[in-house]
Structure formats: structure tokens, C-alpha cells
Curated annotation (Swiss-Prot):
<dbReference type="InterPro" id="IPR000589">
    <property type="entry name" value="Ribosomal_uS15"/>
</dbReference>
<keyword id="KW-0687">Ribonucleoprotein</keyword>
<protein>
    <recommendedName>
        <fullName>Small ribosomal subunit protein uS15</fullName>
    </recommendedName>
</protein>
<dbReference type="GO" id="GO:0003735">
    <property type="term" value="F:structural constituent of ribosome"/>
</dbReference>
<dbReference type="InterPro" id="IPR005290">
    <property type="entry name" value="Ribosomal_uS15_bac-type"/>
</dbReference>
<comment type="function">
    <text>One of the primary rRNA binding proteins, it binds directly to 16S rRNA where it helps nucleate assembly of the platform of the 30S subunit by binding and bridging several RNA helices of the 16S rRNA.</text>
</comment>
<dbReference type="InterPro" id="IPR009068">
    <property type="entry name" value="uS15_NS1_RNA-bd_sf"/>
</dbReference>
<dbReference type="GO" id="GO:0022627">
    <property type="term" value="C:cytosolic small ribosomal subunit"/>
</dbReference>
<keyword id="KW-0694">RNA-binding</keyword>
<comment type="similarity">
    <text>Belongs to the universal ribosomal protein uS15 family.</text>
</comment>
<comment type="subunit">
    <text>Part of the 30S ribosomal subunit. Forms a bridge to the 50S subunit in the 70S ribosome, contacting the 23S rRNA.</text>
</comment>
<keyword id="KW-0699">rRNA-binding</keyword>
<comment type="function">
    <text>Forms an intersubunit bridge (bridge B4) with the 23S rRNA of the 50S subunit in the ribosome.</text>
</comment>
<dbReference type="GO" id="GO:0019843">
    <property type="term" value="F:rRNA binding"/>
</dbReference>
<keyword id="KW-0689">Ribosomal protein</keyword>
<dbReference type="Pfam" id="PF00312">
    <property type="entry name" value="Ribosomal_S15"/>
</dbReference>
<dbReference type="GO" id="GO:0006412">
    <property type="term" value="P:translation"/>
</dbReference>
Length: 89
């Protein structure tokens, strides 16, 4: 259900360039997207889990803030990330 350490490490290397570059906006968005996908499948199976629903909404809001920041700072990196993660339809 949750995103494992190995998955986070792989996403960090893929979007950050190295394993220690965890603060990069693209890495944070990629990890949040993986966690959101995991929570979404959990919510399909457990419709009455209100705590997980709240956690899902918090992660979606955090990802939205980070994407808004990235769009404001560097539109090309934003577009590349959106395309890579298949976000925004």
C-alpha cells in the first residue's frame, strides 16, 4: 500500500539525478504522486477510511502547491514533469 524506501530512492535518482537530491521540486512531486496513487487504490477498497481520505487530500494539496511553485519559477521544468508523470489530462 505505502511507497517503499526503494521506490522513493528510484524516484529520487530518476527525477533528481542522484540519491541525495531529495529536495528538488520534481523529486518531491514524483514521490507525492506515487503516494497519491497508492492511497487512491486504498480508498477504492476502503471507502469508509476517513483518516486515509484526509491524508490523501493533504498530499494532493501539497502536490498542487509544489506544482504551482514550479510553474511560477521554471515553466519548462514544469511542463516536462507534467508530461513525465502524466498529470493534468
Amino acid at each position: 500500500m505505502a511507497v517503499s524506501k526503494q521506490q522513493k530512492h528510484d524516484l529520487t535518482v530518476k527525477f533528481g539525478g542522484s540519491a541525495s537530491n531529495t529536495g528538488k521540486t520534481e523529486v518531491q512531486v514524483a514521490i507525492l504522486s506515487a503516494e497519491i496513487d497508492s492511497l487512491t487504490t486504498h480508498m477504492i477498497e476502503n471507502k469508509k477510511d476517513k483518516a486515509s481520505k484526509r491524508g490523501l487530500y493533504k498530499k494532493v494539496a501539497q502536490r498542487k502547491k509544489l506544482l504551482s511553485y514550479l510553474q511560477r519559477v521554471d515553466i519548462e521544468r514544469y511542463r516536462a514533469l507534467i508530461k513525465e508523470l502524466n498529470l493534468r489530462g
